[in-house]
Amino acid sequence: MGAFRRRSYGASRSPQNRRRRTPREERAMEPSHEKYDRLIARCKSIPPTPTAVVHPCDESSLRGAIDAARVGLITPILVGPTARIREVAAKARLDITKFRIVDAGYSQDSAAKAVELVRNAEAEALMKGSLHTDELMGAVVKRETGLRTSRRISHCFVMDVPGHPDPLIITDAAVNITPSLKDKVDIVQNAIDLAHDLGTAEVRVAILSAMETVNPDVPSTLEAAALCKMADRGQITGALVDGPLALDNAISPEAAKIKKIDSPVAGRANVLVVPDLEAGNMLAKSLTFLAGADAAGIVLGARVPIILTSRADSLTARLASCAVATLVAEARRASTARAVR
């Protein structure tokens, strides 16, 4: 008789045939979101930030506010149709009895009343609920009744990227579609100020393009060069700024070395400024869905930080967004206190 051969009734366990885990699965196996955990831990010594939660009329947005309150990051003020908010809470078995509710008839009314709470010093942050971002921002940017400042409003993602040692700020991937050079000055400065509020000791800003050399045929390289010169002349402050840089030599020391780019930013950037919204949105979503990153979103340049979350966000990303807003609000309180002295 021939040698007995074991039959295999299941999938082969060889490395070649083993199913590769997705980035999300790899991410789930990590013990914690260490970078986000550090941000949340920094908020433990800070009082919860009074936050107007705008139109939390679905389970996702209402639960996000409640979770952030449970951790001690915010004190939610729920702004929207009272009956509908209570209906959502009852259906999802969420306890909202301890939270103040400001009744509003519809989503745009919710946005207007939330902004009014800020103007009346009853709230120090805004948090987007189930209304469209344009509805919320429309109320924020109104000249007479909104929350405008001298700065242009811009958006930052604070990203927790696996394998990257520190949080990575990407701007602007959500608000400014095709920003001008003038717009980008504020976009860069907003991101720098945010990095300092988050406790970054040395802020290193990479102005991204498709290449690391100035090319007259590629407008983003010209704007990058101009922004760097503006930083040299003190028109942008608080950071090392370099560009144009391609993504690889902005975040990879090896790539920067191969390209022979000698710069304190190249290969070590912790703030990435993208040419336009499309590039930024694709970069952030690529990191999220291909590399297992999480993204905490915040809008800056208004009187108060504005928390933007997505229904697809993880619990940790939602909490991180609230932690970022709390740290920004605390930095503004400290700045105001210093100015009064």
Give the residues covered by each predicted segment:
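Short, Lys/Arg-enriched N-terminal segments with co-localized hydrophobic residues
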Residues: 13-28
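Anion-binding alpha/beta catalytic cores of soluble intermediary-metabolism enzymes, centered on
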Residues: 29-77, 81-341
